[in-house]
């Protein structure tokens, strides 16, 4: 009887959680930012694949954040299997084969579902950077790519943290302690840390527990090993001090590009100080605004916590920074 109660509770929790994130308005007439070639002269190509997934190519290396291409219907996520769909991922594989690192902000399925499938297609010098929970989650997948646990390397507002440098010496990554907000009101789902390897491949939404949440600072390096282009990524945020790092790091190099969740935009729109203010970037791209229970072929919808038209109007009023609301699969040359 106890197992039945647990199953029922999990059933209701899954249904409630996924339903709440799928209740936003239509974006049929929203003016997204699409392909753009800018005059920044950074030598960087940025592709927004959707949710928190960006391809960032610079100085001969590509980094992929939060690898998620498989959009599954709400009912399947709530009650069925949650596994990569090759039909949705394969169209992108060719442009991902030079990925040197996959960075995962936290271990919910919408930030890493396609990681095992993509990892099989990558070269031997590609790495996965993420939490202990993520590593334990995918242990039974026997990933062919080396896994770098970032928990003990995190920077905070007061601590410098520890950079990870790719063996090719072309880029380095600093994990920054962040946090995941409630999905809606007081609902916060699948927030456990996992301390032991799973024995079976994850295939249900509750198998993807949150674990530690990160933001990342990415430096593409010049031939002397100094930061040439700097990118900040935060795909989940509860607001400062989460996502903050010592400002002395900015003495070395300011931030050229920021890829941040709509939570950051909402904080600023509500009059709160956000990472957008404290760690300004020349170019800021907003992400994780869409209902990902709909395929890319369908008319996009925003999630319940987001008002994209209002946000775009708000951020157009600023002249100090450039802000973008990219459409899925939009590519930007900077």
Language model regions located:
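Active-site-proximal loop/helix segments of hydrolase catalytic cores
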Residues: 201-278
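Flexible, acidic/histidine-containing loops and adjacent segments that form or flank the divalent-metal
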Residues: 146-223, 227-229, 320-334
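Active-site HxH/HxHxD metal-binding segment of metal-dependent hydrolases
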Residues: 90-186
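Active-site neighborhood of phospho(di)ester-bond hydrolases with catalytic His/Asp-centered motifs
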Residues: 65-66, 99-107, 129-131, 232-237, ...
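Binuclear metal-ion centers of metallo-dependent hydrolases, dominated by the metallo-beta-lactamase
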Residues: 127, 135, 139-168, 272-334
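Active-site environment of divalent metal-dependent phosphoester hydrolases
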Residues: 52, 72, 107-113, 135-138, ...
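N-terminal export signals
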Residues: 2-4, 10-31
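Pre-active-site segment of Zn-dependent metallo-hydrolases
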Residues: 59-104, 108, 113-121, 183-201, ...
């Amino acid at each position: 009887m106890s197992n039945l109660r647990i199953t029922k509770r999990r059933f209701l929790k899954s249904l409630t959680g996924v339903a709440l994130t799928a209740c936003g308005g239509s974006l049929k007439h929203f003016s997204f930012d699409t392909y753009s070639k800018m005059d920044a002269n950074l030598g960087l190509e940025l592709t927004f694949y959707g949710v928190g997934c960006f391809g960032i190519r610079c100085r001969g290396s590509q980094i992929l954040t939060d690898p998620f291409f498989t959009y599954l219907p709400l009912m399947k996520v709530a009650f069925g299997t949650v596994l990569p769909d090759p039909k949705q991922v394969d169209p992108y594989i060719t442009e991902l084969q030079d990925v040197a690192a996959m960075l995962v902000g936290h271990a919910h399925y919408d930030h890493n579902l396609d990681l095992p499938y993509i990892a099989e297609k990558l070269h031997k010098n590609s790495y996965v950077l993420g939490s202990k929970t993520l590593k334990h989650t995918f242990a039974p997948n026997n990933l062919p790519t080396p896994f770098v646990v970032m928990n003990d390397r995190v920077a905070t507002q007061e601590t410098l943290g520890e950079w990870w440098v790719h063996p090719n010496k072309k880029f380095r990554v600093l994990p920054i302690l962040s946090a995941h907000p409630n999905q809606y009101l007081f609902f916060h789902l699948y927030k456990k840390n996992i301390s032991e390897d799973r024995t079976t491949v994850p295939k249900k939404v509750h198998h993807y527990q949150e674990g530690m949440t990160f933001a990342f600072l990415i430096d593409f390096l010049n031939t002397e090993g100094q930061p040439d282009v700097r990118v900040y990524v935060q795909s989940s945020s509860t607001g400062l001090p989460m996502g903050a790092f010592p400002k002395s790091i900015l003495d070395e190099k300011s931030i050229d590009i920021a890829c941040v969740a709509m939570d950051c935009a909402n904080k600023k729109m509500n009059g709160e100080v956000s990472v957008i203010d404290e760690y300004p970037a020349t170019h800021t791209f907003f992400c994780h605004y869409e209902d990902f229970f709909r395929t890319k072929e369908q008319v996009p919808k925003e999630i319940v916590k987001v008002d994209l038209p209002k946000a775009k109007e708000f951020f157009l009023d600023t002249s100090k920074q450039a802000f973008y609301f990219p459409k899925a699969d939009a590519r930007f040359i900077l």
